[in-house]
């Protein structure tokens, strides 16, 4: 019963978070349909990544609705339970109340840190966080060539090349590409531009983490769905957008199911982490759109 309740709460939380995005009914339906297989896969493994994804989306939604204090709670809660919640800070520059958001982050960080001390000693809580950090560092090294972990852009490049190099050679350029659109300050006021940042942030979290596993791609598929319905290039590159979406559904989402030829899955997709390929191409296109499209001009 506990497991069933856990899965229902996580799924309900994610569904509610997506429903709060400013999407038309058909757009909402597309996002759900694109991601449903990966959400189902994550549910079967009782993955907390469902809840983390919901928190990141909610942090975006609450900043959009100017409820920065509660957005801070989502960011802190996600960060202090699985670290990935820190991605919510990607929307900081879109906040109209940055001081309120900053003070909220400090307030909730203190509350969430102290709360376990109601039933555990301060020493135990501090030691637990230190051990958690040490484990994350240790696992980062183990995951580099793990078949079932690091199913990311990092893992794909390591496995295809067979080379052992520092992930920083990929992460640093990735961070620069991710951050470059922030320079287009005039575009901040356009909702489509901000939506693309949500998609980019969710994809970045998956593509540039050595801890990414199959179940984590529910986050990426939600990001892909949001990009597809909110991209400003539907009129200029509709064929390419549709191709990338179908390619992503086939290789990223369905490659782990029995609908996909087993020999391709076992001999190519899994050994070379090719699940990351379509999402990488889409992420690069998102960054290109953010850097080149005029979001200020009213869209059709």
Question: What is the meaning of each model-derived region?
Answer:
Residues 54-65, 92, 96, 100-101, ...:
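Transmembrane alpha-helices and membrane-interface helical segments
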Residues 3-6, 77, 237:
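Compositionally biased, low-complexity segments enriched in small residues
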Residues 228-300:
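Aromatic-enriched
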Residues 75-92, 209-219:
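Transmembrane helices and adjacent periplasmic/lumenal helix-loop junctions
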């Amino acid at each position: 019963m506990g497991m069933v309740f856990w899965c229902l709460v996580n799924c309900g939380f994610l569904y509610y978070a997506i429903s709060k995005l400013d999407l038309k009914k058909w757009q909402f339906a597309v996002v759900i349909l694109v991601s449903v297989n990966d959400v189902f896969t994550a549910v079967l493994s009782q993955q907390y990544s469902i809840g983390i994804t919901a928190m990141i989306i909610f942090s975006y939604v609450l900043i959009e609705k100017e409820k920065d204090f509660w957005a801070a709670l989502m960011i802190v809660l996600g960060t202090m339970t699985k670290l990935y919640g820190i991605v919510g800070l990607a929307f900081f520059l879109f906040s109209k109340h940055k001081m309120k958001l900053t003070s909220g982050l400090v307030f909730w960080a203190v509350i969430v840190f102290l709360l376990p001390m109601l039933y555990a000693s301060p020493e135990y809580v501090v030691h637990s966080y230190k051990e958690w950090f040490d484990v994350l560092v240790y696992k980062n090294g183990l995951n580099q060539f793990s078949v079932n972990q690091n199913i990311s852009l990092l893992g794909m490049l390591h496995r295809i090349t067979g080379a052992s190099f520092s992930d920083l050679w990929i992460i640093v350029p990735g961070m620069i590409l991710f951050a470059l659109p922030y320079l287009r300050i005039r575009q901040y006021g356009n909702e489509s531009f901000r939506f693309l940042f949500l998609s980019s942030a969710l994809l970045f979290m998956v593509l540039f983490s050595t801890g990414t596993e199959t179940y984590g791609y529910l986050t990426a598929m939600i990001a892909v769905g949001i990009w597809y319905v909110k991209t400003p290039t539907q009129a200029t590159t509709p064929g390419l957008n549709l191709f990338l979406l179908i390619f992503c559904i086939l290789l990223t989402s369905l490659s782990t199911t029995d609908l996909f030829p087993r020999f391709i899955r076992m001999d190519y997709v899994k050994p070379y982490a090719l699940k990351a390929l379509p999402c990488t191409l889409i992420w690069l296109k998102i960054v290109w759109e953010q850097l080149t499209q005029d979001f200020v001009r009213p869209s059709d």
